[in-house]
Amino acid sequence: MPNRKYADGEVVMGRWPGSVLYYEVQVTSYDDASHLYTVKYKDGTELALKESDIRLQSSFKQRKSQSSSSSPSRRSRSRSRSRSPGRPAKGRRRSSSHSREHKEDKKKIIQETSLAPPKPSENNTRRYNGEPDSTERNDTSSKLLEQQKLKPDVEMERVLDQYSLRSRREEKKKEEIYAEKKIFEAIKTPEKPSSKTKELEFGGRFGTFMLMFFLPATVLYLVLMCKQDDPSLMNFPPLPALESLWETKVFGVFLLWFFFQALFYLLPIGKVVEGLPLSNPRKLQYRINGFYAFLLTAAAIGTLLYFQFELHYLYDHFVQFAVSAAAFSMALSIYLYIRSLKAPEEDLAPGGNSGYLVYDFFTGHELNPRIGSFDLKYFCELRPGLIGWVVINLAMLLAEMKIHNQSMPSLSMILVNSFQLLYVVDALWNEEAVLTTMDITHDGFGFMLAFGDLVWVPFVYSLQAFYLVGHPIAISWPVAAAITILNCIGYYIFRSANSQKNNFRRNPADPKLSYLKVIPTATGKGLLVTGWWGFVRHPNYLGDIIMALAWSLPCGFNHILPYFYVIYFICLLVHREARDEHHCKKKYGLAWERYCQRVPYTHISLHLLEHSTYLICKLKYTSHLCTWSVCYLGFKH
C-alpha cells in the first residue's frame, strides 16, 4: 500500500470539488481504506479529497513567480519598441505600479473569498446528532432548463452543489463557473481502475470454494425435502440414485427454454438505453424488452395448453430440471472464465480480479461479457430464471388441480402465484432499473450470478408452490385478505423506495424531483436524505422482507420448510447491506459518515427498536449475530 504524501496538520492547497479553484486547507486525517484526505478549510468546512486534488503551497508560489517574471532582454526589448505618432492607440497602457496595485487588489479579493450557501438552494440548517446538517434542497433544476444545455454530469454537479464561491466584492457569474467546469472535464484524464482486488468477500478462496458445492447441495436438499410426506428438518430424504438425477430429454427441454428466451432478447422491439458510465468511462447500450418477452412467453404457454400439452411435466421432473440447470450454469461459468482471460484490463470486474482462480471463477472475472451486442449477464439477470419462476408456479398450480382432482386451485396456491407474479411483472416492467444495481455495475459474471439466476431463483423461489402441491393448506377468506394487505404494504414500500432512487440516479435534474434533499459528495453525486431514504438507509430491503413473509404465510405453520425463503432472504439482505455499507464508505468517505449520522438506522426494525426497552435492544444485537452466522447463503441473484 503506498505511503501517504501529506501529514496531519500540514497546510496545503486543496481543490474545491467540481471546480478548478484551489484554497488553503489543513490536513486533519487520512483514511487508509479509501485513500482520502480529510481537510479543513479556513471557514471550518471539512471535506474528503483525493491526493490528486491536493497541491503543495510552494508549487503555487513558484508558478506565480514564473508567470510574473520575464527575462531582462525581453523587458528591454519591449520597452525600447516605439509607436509612431500618427498611429491610434488601442488602449491606455497601465504603469507597472498600477498593475502591481491591481494584482495586490485581486489577491485580496481571492483571499476574501468565502464559502457561503447559495440563496436559491434553501439549505436546511437544523442540527442532527450535534452537527449542522447542510443538506441541499434540489430547487435549482427548473433554472437549469432555462440555462444553456450542459452535459448530464455537469448538470448533476450543478444541482448537488452545496456551496457557492462568492467574493465579498462581487459574485462570479454562474455561466463562467460552469464553463470552467466544462474545460476541466475536457482536459481531465479518466482514472484507471485498480488492477487487483485486494478485499476478498464470501470467506475468500476457501469460502467461495465451499459455496460452489454447498449451494447446489442446498437446492437438491430443499427439492427432495418438499417431495416427502413429512418434510421436517431432521427427517433427511434418502439419497436418490445418480442415474435418476439426469435425463437427457429434460436437459434438452431446458436448453430449448434458454435459447427460446435468447431469441426474444434479440428481437428488435423495445427501447435502447445507455447504462451507467464504466471505469473506461464508456457506456454500454441495452435493449429494454423483458416485458415483451414475458408477454410472448405467456402467449406461447397459452398455445401449448390449448393443444393439451401437459405442463405438470415440470412437477414430475422437477429434480431433473434443477440438476440440468445446475449443470448448464457450471458449463456457462467455465466458458465465462476462459473468455475473461483474454479480456482487456478495463473490462474486468472490480470485485473479481484477485488473481486467485477459484475466487475469480466464483465472483466473476469479466464485468460485462458480450457476444457482439448480446450481453450475457444482463440477459440472465431477468429472463430465463425470473420468467421461468412464473412458469414453474403455473405448472405447480395445474399439478395441484390434477393430483387432488380439483376443479379450481386452492386459495393458498392462488395467493402464492398472484403475489410472485406481481413481483416478476414489476421487475420486468421496471427492467431499466436493474442497470443501476451492483449486479450490473460492480459484480462480474461468474458462477455466483450464473447459478443464482438460472438455478436458485426458479427452483428455490418457487418452493412455496412446490410445497403446496404435496401439502395442501386450507385458509379462510379473512386470513387471505390479511395476507394480501401485508403483501400490498411490502410492495408499496419496495416500489416507492426503488422508484425514488432509480429516478434520481437517472436524472437528478428532473423538475419532478425538485423536492428531494441530498448530501453532496466529492464524486459529484448526491446521497438522498428525503422520503424513505431519509427514514432508513435500506427501505427497499424492508419491503422485500415483508413480501417474502406474505409469500410463505399461505403455506401454514406445520413445517418450517416453506419459510426457508424468508430466513434466506434476511441473511441475503444482511450480507448485501454490509457490502453496500462498505462500498459506499469507501466511495463517498466523509460524506457517507455525515449521511450515517443523518440516517442512523439501516432498516425500519432498528428504528422502532430504539424506542423499546433495553431488553429488546439487546435482542436486536443478538439477532444480528445470529444472521451473520449463516450469511454465506446470502449470495446475490
Swiss-Prot record:
Signal peptide: none annotated. It catalyses: 5alpha-cholest-8,14-dien-3beta-ol + NADPH + H(+) = 5alpha-cholest-8-en-3beta-ol + NADP(+); 4,4-dimethyl-5alpha-cholesta-8,24-dien-3beta-ol + NADP(+) = 4,4-dimethyl-5alpha-cholesta-8,14,24-trien-3beta-ol + NADPH + H(+); 4,4-dimethyl-8,14-cholestadien-3beta-ol + NADPH + H(+) = 4,4-dimethyl-5alpha-cholest-8-en-3beta-ol + NADP(+). Pfam families: ERG4_ERG24, LBR_tudor. PROSITE patterns: STEROL_REDUCT_1, STEROL_REDUCT_2. InterPro entries: ERG24_DHCR-like (IPR001171), Lamin-B_rcpt_of_tudor (IPR019023), Sterol_reductase_CS (IPR018083), Tudor (IPR002999). Residues 98-110, 124-151 have a biased composition (Basic and acidic residues). One of its GO terms (molecular function) is Delta14-sterol reductase activity. It is a multi-pass membrane protein. The chain crosses the membrane at residues 206-226, 250-270, 288-309, 317-338, 378-399, 403-425, 466-486, 554-574. Residues 74-97 have a biased composition (Basic residues). Its EC number is 1.3.1.70. The modification Phosphoserine is found at residues 95-96. GO terms for cellular component: cytoplasm; endoplasmic reticulum membrane; nuclear inner membrane; nucleus. It is an enzyme of class 1 (oxidoreductase). Residues 57-73 have a biased composition (Low complexity). Keywords: Cholesterol biosynthesis, Cholesterol metabolism, Cytoplasm, DNA-binding, Endoplasmic reticulum, Lipid biosynthesis, Lipid metabolism, Membrane, Nucleus, Oxidoreductase, Phosphoprotein, Receptor, Steroid biosynthesis, Steroid metabolism, Sterol biosynthesis, Sterol metabolism, Transmembrane, Transmembrane helix. It is found in: Nucleus inner membrane; Nucleus; Cytoplasm; Endoplasmic reticulum membrane. Interacts with DNA. Interaction with DNA is sequence independent with higher affinity for supercoiled and relaxed circular DNA than linear DNA. Catalyzes the reduction of the C14-unsaturated bond of lanosterol, as part of the metabolic pathway leading to cholesterol biosynthesis. Anchors the lamina and the heterochromatin to the inner nuclear membrane. The Tudor domain may not recognize methylation marks, but rather bind unassembled free histone H3. PANTHER family: DELTA(14)-STEROL REDUCTASE (PTHR21257), DELTA(14)-STEROL REDUCTASE LBR (PTHR21257:SF55). Belongs to the ERG4/ERG24 family. This is Delta(14)-sterol reductase LBR. It comes from Gallus gallus (Chicken).
